[in-house]
Regions:
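Short glycine/proline-centered loop/turn elements that form peptide/ligand docking sites
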Residues: 1-4, 16-19, 28-30, 38-39, ...
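Helix-turn-helix
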Residues: 12, 20-54, 58
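Solvent-exposed, amphipathic alpha-helical segments
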Residues: 16-24, 70, 74, 95, ...
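Short linear capping/connector segments at secondary-structure termini
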Residues: 72-75, 105-112, 195
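Secondary-structure edge/capping motif, primarily at the C-terminal ends of alpha-helices
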Residues: 74-75, 103, 157-162
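Amphipathic alpha-helical packing segments from all-alpha helical-bundle domains
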Residues: 110-158, 165-176
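C-terminal peripheral helix-coil segments that are non-catalytic and often amphipathic
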Residues: 128-132, 136, 163-231
Length: 231
């Protein structure tokens, strides 16, 4: 019973933090502001999440699974998982380009060591599934090292400035280099890039963000406990 109460409280904190992070911005939202929104003392909140980065880490864990599930639904039936990989980064970059709050959230996830480690570990496991046919003799260490490079490419693609190239140029360069690291043949690289740029990737990015917020808000106690057991 006590454990259930703990998980219920953690879920309430996560739901409130998600809403505030994606409405006001991750950087602009303090632990104190989250605690106030929950009518909870800061000390009580930090009992569950010692810092804001711990909260972000919980969200990133949930986002990695959710976003991968969602992005596969946007590619044509029978399409390879490689296309889903290409669309995921493209949609993330597109939403970051038009939504500063979303950009702040995604860049924070790629900046803090705790969350960056989650992203790299998750993506390395996924890469074995997606790129295994091109890297049949690779070890786990090689996938891990590749994702260190790739996470930097992904961050640079989303982190735009006034001097940044247009999104289609950035996506072309990023996806080509990512697939090149994983030894994908040039013909396939060009085909996937062309096809993903023909998609409504900005609208898809918007929809994925909306659906993630709804997913967090609608997650019940039982579903949250199941997520915790998978970690």
């Amino acid at each position: 019973m006590a454990r259930r109460r703990v998980n219920t409280t953690k879920l309430e904190i996560i739901q409130t933090a998600t809403r505030m992070f994606l409405e006001n911005g991750y950087s602009a939202t303090s632990i104190k502001a989250i605690a106030n929104a929950l009518d909870m003392s800061t000390g009580h909140l930090t009992f569950y999440f010692p810092t804001k980065e711990y909260l972000l880490a919980e969200l990133v864990e949930m986002l990695c699974d959710f976003q991968w599930t969602q992005v596969r639904q946007y590619v044509d039936e029978g399409e390879s998982l490689l296309m889903a990989i290409c669309l995921e980064l493209t949609a993330m970059a597109a939403i970051c380009e038009e939504n500063e709050v979303a950009k702040d959230f995604y860049l924070a996830a790629y900046t803090h060591p705790m969350t960056l480690e989650i992203i790299r570990k998750n993506d390395a496991q996924r890469a074995k599934l997606v790129f295994g046919e091109y890297c049949a003799d690779w070890t786990q260490t090689q996938y891990t090292e590749a994702e260190i490079l790739i996470s930097g490419i992904e961050y640079a693609t989303m982190m735009t400035t006034r001097e940044s190239a247009p999104i289609d140029v950035r996506i072309t360069g990023a996806l080509n280099n990512i697939m090149l690291i994983y030894q994908v043949p040039e013909k396939i690289r060009k085909n996937k890039i062309r096809r993903v740029l023909d998609m409504e990737y900005t609208a898809i990015g918007r929809q994925m963000l909306v659906e993630f917020i709804a997913y967090i808000e609608e997650t019940n106690e039982q579903a949250f406990e199941a997520l915790l057991r998978r970690k």
